[in-house]
Amino acid sequence: MATKLDYYAVLEVTRDANGDELKKAYRRLAMQYHPDRNPGDASAEARFKEINEAYDILKDEQKRAAYDRFGHAAFEGGGPGAGGFDFGGGLGDIFEQMFGDMMGGRRGGRRSGSDIQIQVSISFTEAFTGVKKPITVPTRVTCESCEGTGSADRDQGAETCPTCHGAGKVRAQQGFFLVERACPTCHGAGKVVRNPCAACHGAGTVERERTLEVAIPAGVEDGTRIRLSGEGEAGGKGAAPGDLYIHVAVEPHPIFQRDGANIYCRVPLRMSLAALGTEIEVPVVDGSRTKVKVPAGTQTGENFRLRGKGFSVLRSSARGDMYIQVSVETPRHLTKRQRELLEEFEAEAGDHERANPESTGFFSKVRDFFEGKL
């Protein structure tokens, strides 16, 4: 058996090279020794295969760790990377290796695309009315060069794996157990690419940015998660794509507050208008205005309900309400005439219980308290 070169030497990098350095070296060398650039050159083709083999191992953290520990033996028959057990991970890893594939574990079958998580900020008003938002999603999409096959030769495409014969799994005797696990050659895909696509390096997908228009329904709350099935990263070599999860962040409003489907708006009101009664015009979240009658004698904290002016309730035809909360303002700075009028008012009001029922009742209780009646 021919002696294999060190994978780090094949990629012309040091053993502490990071992922970006590995990728850069791989792309440079793969381009240099690609068979399309070296037609009929058997040595270049062999070198190209070595480069792909080395990168396939070193780009994967688990495979790289196994290679650093055991060398090429990790991926040969009986080695830890090719079916043997590595007890360094504890009992959980051992049982996952033994039973993971038979019970639908992560190693079996083609690898579906990853899910994507993205946050979208919308205004309070947009949450009220609903909105369509264009979003840019960094993702992996099907490679156009090879149409997702991962092969430079579209007609040939991927070949049936010679190890598992297309099953994606292999069986091995481990002591008393017959263990079924993902094929170490094709990693569960059932197929292998002999001539990898230069654009996607055999993955079948490439990194791109996509722009989507997302419909955010009326009534969403801060923290709502929206799932778009199949809009995640493309699966490798024909596998199913992942999903896109949009986390909605609703910006606060300077005038309105929200509690569930209900909206609250605090409206300051002059003391005189609260005493005499009035009609006020208040804003609604959708930009319209409505009038509210405030009866004479209105106190701070009283609410006036506007039915159906709140948020839509998701997956329902119901709507919340809007509440106008009155806050009676006491003037801080008075003119001489205003002070005189208030003094006249106070002298006239006196202890008149009908005019000031709450204060009269309160001070009556205070008097009873000091007299020992309470």
Swiss-Prot record:
Disulfide bonds: none annotated. SMART domains: DnaJ (SM00271). GO terms for cellular component: cytoplasm. It holds the Pfam family DnaJ_C. Keywords: Chaperone, Cytoplasm, DNA replication, Metal-binding, Repeat, Stress response, Zinc, Zinc-finger. Zn(2+) 2 binds at residues 161, 164, 183, 186. The keyword Transcription regulation does not apply. Residues 6-71 form the J domain. Participates actively in the response to hyperosmotic and heat shock by preventing the aggregation of stress-denatured proteins and by disaggregating proteins, also in an autonomous, DnaK-independent fashion. Unfolded proteins bind initially to DnaJ; upon interaction with the DnaJ-bound protein, DnaK hydrolyzes its bound ATP, resulting in the formation of a stable complex. GrpE releases ADP from DnaK; ATP binding to DnaK triggers the release of the substrate protein, thus completing the reaction cycle. Belongs to the DnaJ family. This is Chaperone protein DnaJ. It comes from Gluconacetobacter diazotrophicus (strain ATCC 49037 / DSM 5601 / CCUG 37298 / CIP 103539 / LMG 7603 / PAl5).
